[in-house]
Amino acid sequence: MAEEEKMRRQLVLAKPFSLEDEKDSELTASSVIRKILSLIKTVRPGSDLTNFQLPPQLILPRSRLQCYGEMIYSFGGQDLLGECSRRNIPIERLKSVVTWNISTLRPVVVGMSPYNPILGETHHVSNGYINVLTEQVMHHPPVSALHATHEQENIDVTWCQYFTPKFRGAYVDVEVNGKRIMKLLHHKETYEMDQPRLIMKFLPAPGAHWAGKVKIKCPETDLEAELHLISDSFIERFRGNNNRSIKGKIFESSSGNQLYNIFGHWDRTVMAKNLKTGGLEVIYNANENITGLKPPTVKNLQEVMESESTIVWSEVSEGILKKDWERAREAKILVEEKQREALKQREASGESWVPKHFSVVKDGKDWHCSPLQPTVPRAPLVITEK
């Protein structure tokens, strides 16, 4: 019992960043930006910031693996992932995949960054029928793998991604490399999706925006979608406005025949217009899906892996949440030193590290991650119903 209580105290489960949390974030954005500008004044434009070290005051109390997982298991309304398979006709399924993809766009805390996961770190959470497992499968470059399955609707989602942040003077441009693959196994359909880039601006007004083009394609149904995430203009940023508009279309891949127009704002509502009938429908409501988000709770403490993000970074998170910056700094150094020591031991013994849950293959500049198990088991950390 004493050991179990000790382990329970080690788990630090931070609340996901919800839509309503942005107002609090905006109040502190100016002071955060001042700290960042003082840190990067010697960094040249175009520099890769992947290994740039931030002080604890600018770090979120969660791992990047948690941020990836939250995009799937953390939602406040309808199970949009399950809806992708419940639709009876192909065009409705593609629209549902578009809706789910939009739902993975989450607000970003301006000027703040999560922990860079250590090699072999994992995060495993369940929400209803959805089970999500992430693992850090490489460190240079920092490749993260994700596998999610929906027990009831027989859906399989895999990601293999790594990001490249570049300093551009007045902003940081974060390119997210890798594809998202969704398989609707009941329908024998595969959907391949690009990922947007993240623009974090410092001047003239601080702000973080998803931008770029996202393609969603299903070869089996000959249907495709293109979404354009539009970054705010200079004037909008200067006024402190967050436009966050999204425009796009759904069309037949072979003929190019356009079926729907997509438009709206990913942090508000997104509409679809049927070009044949002229009918309009709301396909996504952010207020219903990404507000009131809750952290996971511990269901089975004995099954929590030592590699779990919330254990690996627990001491750092405790320090950050209590604003004990020295404690957080020392704890972060300890985590990083343990990782370096493990690397030295492997090199000394000639041992090669391999991921526990994924196989990883390099294909040109890209990386492909395949889960070793067909489904993700129920997790010891769960999202409980409201």
From Swiss-Prot:
Q: Which cysteines are joined by disulfide bonds?
A: none
Biological process GO terms, please? lipid transport
Keywords on this record?
A: Lipid transport, Lipid-binding, Transport
Q: In which tissues is this gene expressed?
A: Expressed in roots, stems and flowers.
InterPro entries in UniProt: OSBP_sf, Oxysterol-bd
Query: Which SUPFAM superfamilies did the record assign?
Result: Oxysterol-binding protein-like
GO molecular function (one): lipid binding
The question of whether Transport is a record keyword is answered with yes
| Biological role | May be involved in the transport of sterols.
Which family does the UniProt entry place this protein in?
Answer: Belongs to the OSBP family.
Record-given protein name: Oxysterol-binding protein-related protein 4A
Recorded source organism is Arabidopsis thaliana (Mouse-ear cress)
